[in-house]
A protein has these predicted regions:
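ATP/NTP-dependent adenylation/nucleotidyl-transfer catalytic domains that generate, transfer
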Residues: 169-171, 228, 237-240, 254, ...
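Enzyme catalytic cores with a strong preference for nitrogen-chemistry domains
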Residues: 1-356, 368, 372-381, 413
């Protein structure tokens, strides 16, 4: 279980009602197939050894004995599999019949887990045959059964108990059965609080119109509420269709996200690679996730390498892949940004808002947000003072785009050529114009901030910052230059998302505005602080610090889920295969780790700005890190990859 990943599987076998021998052969076949693909936890549907739709046959001695014989066969045939297998059967204990899950490992039944909530409404008549787990004395009893060798063994019948792997302590799971999920207080809630990172549900949920969507949402939302993985195996083909139809709707969800789903009315296996470290990190982070005491059964599994074949990592984790969802998200984000800014403008009684408009992505987004905020407040857009400040690195393309944007949005444009002021400043401090050092670059950035701040004072306004989350993570901002403003609207927006927000605005506008926004998107990302070559941008940010799609990927998994460098590298290797080789990924990952630590001092004094997503670097909110923290541990791991 390297890096906390474990493969789990839900299987729907072909069944014959009451034909335990046939059912067992199908279950064993699928169990072996899943184990061969690396699954460590394999679950089957409710009452799968007999079939769920046996009716009054559940009261027949022959069927009950056949179910136990079938369980012994499962134990014997799967004894060599490096996996835990969970199957369903009817089990008689002290004259009462329980609908149970049998947890099987290394040829033994670790325990039986009985169903708690026995439905007896609509099409369900389970109380005709089964009793609830609530009838157990103290929530636990035991039952003597014959094992595969013909020996009598005592197996516990338990509730409020989880199962934990000795070799992989994060591999913990609890079991509930079908209806248990559909009630106001499912057993899985307590099981998760006891420490179960995976909830297994053996189900026989019949299909009616609209139920699949409800079921899907139920599983997904329960996994999110419990910060767990939810493994749901549903009965399917072969169950009696006398009155009902079963679709074999298998589902695997993790922390609110659906990872795998079977095709309706099909048989077979679905898989997912679950990130147990991520789940543990989320529970640790959320101090409101309460823990309670419960029973624990341990089991042993030989650790096996996981190739992550059934795990995907979004290439742009901050940006939804689905266009409809992406557009919806973009609209929501722009509204959040604009509302935050509008509230601040109203509170400060600012008459104007000043923004440095370079013609690049970040300042364009800041202008878009400003326009939305002014429209919200029903203010004249002429109160927006867009300032272009050409200097040594400015190109005609970016300056022209800035001018076109100001005109298209109907805001006030002011041009302040800062070359003379910067020349004088360089003379004052003895800086040669031929020395293209950090002083040459930062002198321009700080001069621009000086101009903006003084214009804001002069016009009774406030400076709106343009820097984005990716730049803050890398420290790609001049301290007390573009780093500083009176309100930063982009501080929670990573560069990959900035691009999509501007593209969204371009898609919903017409004419010249759409054209100029598209040209902004096509312009290389650059601070334009070094002289151009042949009139073209010579200083390209991604050539210097690396591709933003990589840095945003690193940033997301480091901050959101606490991934270590080796785990980030592994995820990036899988995600960017064919795009970047391992050497390139390692190079920029090392750069990211180094810069992230050394540049914290800039983030420790950020201006106010709205939180937009779950990953942000505000020192007053989500990220509180000392400016003098040492990166040695992270760099050592990154450099050793």
């Amino acid at each position: 279980m390297r890096d906390g990943f474990i493969k789990i599987a839900a299987a729907t076998p072909d069944l014959h009602v009451a034909d335990c021998a046939y059912n067992t052969s199908e279950i064993v076949k699928l169990a072996k197939e899943a184990a061969a693909k690396g699954a460590k936890l394999i679950t089957f549907p409710e009452l799968c050894l007999t079939g769920y739709t046996c009716g009054d046959l559940f009261l027949q001695e022959t069927l009950l004995e056949g179910a136990l014989d079938a369980l012994n066969t499962v134990c014997r045939e799967t004894a060599e599999l490096a996996a835990v297998i969970v199957v369903g059967l009817p089990l008689r204990v002290r004259g009462k019949l329980y609908n149970v899950a049998a947890v099987v490992n290394a040829g033994d039944v670790l325990a039986f887990v009985p169903k708690t909530h026995i439905p007896n409404y609509s099409e369900f008549y389970e109380q005709r045959h089964f009793v609830s787990a609530d009838t157990l004395s103290g929530g636990m009893e035991s039952v003597d059964i014959k094992n595969a060798d013909g020996e009598t063994v005592c197996v516990p019948l338990v509730t409020d108990t989880i199962f934990q792997c000795d070799e992989q302590p994060l591999f913990t799971f609890g079991v509930e059965i079908c209806e248990d999920l559909w009630v106001p207080n499912p057993p899985s809630t307590a099981l998760a609080q006891m420490g179960a990172h995976i909830i297994v549900n053996l189900s026989a949920s019949d299909e009616i119109i609209g139920k699949a969507g409800y079921r899907r949402d139920l599983v997904r939302q329960q996994s999110g509420r419990l910060l767990c993985a939810y493994l749901y195996a549903d009965a399917g083909f072969g169950e009696s269709t006398q009155d009902l139809v079963f679709a074999g709707h298998d589902l695997i969800a993790e922390n609110g996200a659906l990872l795998a789903e079977s095709k309706m009315f099909s048989q077979g296996i679905i898989y997912a690679d679950i990130d147990l470290q991520r789940l543990a990190h989320e529970r640790q982070r959320m101090n409101t996730f309460e823990s309670i005491e419960g029973g624990v059964f341990s089991f042993s599994l030989e650790p096996v390498e996981n190739d992550l074949a059934d795990r995907t990592f979004p290439r742009t984790p901050f940006v939804p892949a689905n266009k409809a969802l992406r557009d919806e998200r973009c609209e929501e984000i722009l509204t959040l940004q604009a509302t935050g800014l509008a509230t601040r403008l109203r509170h400060t009684h600012a008459k104007t808002a000043v923004v440095g408009l370079s013609g690049g992505l970040d300042s364009t987004l800041a202008l878009i947000v400003l326009v939305h905020a002014f429209d919200m407040l029903e203010l004249d857009r002429k109160g927006i003072l867009a300032v272009t400040m050409p200097c040594f690195g400015t190109t005609a393309r970016t300056k022209g785009n800035a001018e076109k944007l100001a005109e298209a949005y109907g805001v006030t444009l002011k041009t302040v050529d800062i070359k003379a002021a910067v020349d004088q400043h360089f003379m004052d401090i003895g800086q040669s114009k031929d020395d293209l050092s950090v002083t040459f670059e930062n002198g321009q950035a700080r001069m621009r901030t000086l101009v903006l701040m003084n214009l804001a004072n002069k016009n009774g306004g406030m400076v709106v910052g343009t820097g984005d989350l990716s730049e803050l993570a890398l420290g790609w901002a001049t301290y007390n230059g573009d780093h500083m403003s009176m309100y930063g609207v982009n501080g929670s927006i990573p560069k990959t998302l900035v691009r999509y927000l501007v593209a969204y605005e371009a898609d919903r506008t017409l004419g010249e505005l759409s054209d100029v926004l598209q040209d902004v998107l096509d312009t290389p990302v650059s601070p334009e602080l070094l002289p151009p070559k042949d009139g073209e941008i010579s200083q390209k940010t991604e050539d210097l610090v690396g591709p933003y799609e990589l840095h945003d990927f690193f940033l997301y998994y480091m901050l959101r889920f606490g991934y270590a460098p080796r785990k980030i590298f592994r995820a990036a290797h899988k995600t960017f295969a064919g795009v970047y080789d391992d050497a390139t990924i390692k190079k920029w990952l090392t750069t990211f780790m180094r810069r992230f630590f050394t540049q914290q001092f800039k983030r420790s004094c950020l201006p106010d700005g709205p939180k937009v997503g779950t990953v942000t670097l505000s020192p007053r909110g989500d990220w509180r890190m000392p400016s003098d923290a040492v990166s040695a541990l992270w760099l050592k791991e990154a450099e050793s990859l």
